[in-house]
A protein has these predicted regions:
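A short, N-terminal "cap"/entry segment at the start of jelly-roll beta-barrel domains
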Residues: 1-56, 105-115, 180-193
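A short beta-loop-beta micro-motif enriched in histidine and acidic residues
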Residues: 48-57, 67-79, 98-100
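Short, solvent-exposed loop/turn positions at domain surfaces
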Residues: 57, 77, 111, 119-120, ...
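His/acidic/aromatic-lined binding-pocket segments of jelly-roll/cupin-type domains
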Residues: 60-61, 72, 78-83, 122-123, ...
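Conserved metal-binding segment of the jelly-roll/cupin
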Residues: 64, 120-145
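Glycine- and acidic-residue-biased ligand/ion/polar-headgroup-sensing regions
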Residues: 65, 76-98, 104, 111
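Short beta-strand His + acidic residue motifs that chelate non-heme Fe in jelly-roll/DSBH
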Residues: 70-72, 90-91, 132-133, 139-144, ...
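Double-stranded beta-helix
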Residues: 96-116, 140-193
Length: 193
């Protein structure tokens, strides 16, 4: 991924945040990724880290419609994914869908209510709706409408050791080709709680 692509996606995210009247704190930490897959138009995400404390984490995220965050799970992190604007298409599995066929129900909380979702079946969160994901629930998401902002409120986020992707090619710490200067401040990758 080129730095010019990172800058472009972050500029798009900043414009969307402004249109949606989402104010950021001074000097926020930005990250844009194609997950190391080389095609950010199909798999990509912009994250703005708002807080990452030992007890909690908050992010606001942006992606273009149908720009997927690939199937993954966490070993420790519990998180709420919140549709802040637009629409978020979610798909859930109890196990890695690349190694185990999608079968059986997935038990989750949506808007604080216990729900059963069919494994591998997509559903949509609309503005204000949230889903609570506990460690071990495999999930994939993508905006299904323009101007979608996705919130995340979670326990501490350990990007380096607590993201497990179904596709072994995914690399969230992939190299950025420096074809122009960075326009947005990035995440600190060595932060510890």
């Amino acid at each position: 991924m080129k730095q010019s692509d990172v800058n472009l996606l972050c500029r798009e995210a900043a414009a969307c945040l402004q249109r949606m009247n989402w104010a950021l704190p001074p000097e926020p930490q930005w990250a844009a990724t194609d997950f190391g897959l080389g095609d950010y138009s199909s798999a990509g995400l912009v994250e703005v880290l708002l807080a990452n404390e030992p007890e909690y984490c908050e992010k606001i995220m942006y992606a273009r419609p149908d720009m997927v965050t690939p199937t993954h799970t966490h070993g420790k992190k519990k998180e709420d994914i919140v549709c802040r604007s637009g629409a978020v298409r979610m798909t859930l599995w109890n196990e890695n869908p690349l190694t185990h066929p999608a079968s059986g129900p997935v038990r989750v909380q949506i808007n604080g209510q216990e729900r059963t979702i069919a494994s591998g079946e997509a559903f949509v969160l609309t503005p204000g709706e949230r889903i609570t994901l506990v460690p071990g629930i495999w999930h994939e998401f993508a905006p299904s409408a323009p101007d979608t902002l996705i919130g995340e409120v979670s326990t501490w986020c350990d990007e380096a050791t607590d993201n497990f992707f179904a596709d072994p090619r995914v690399d969230i710490f992939h190299a950025i080709e420096p074809d122009e200067a960075p326009e947005f401040g990035g995440f600190a990758t060595d932060a510890q709680p």
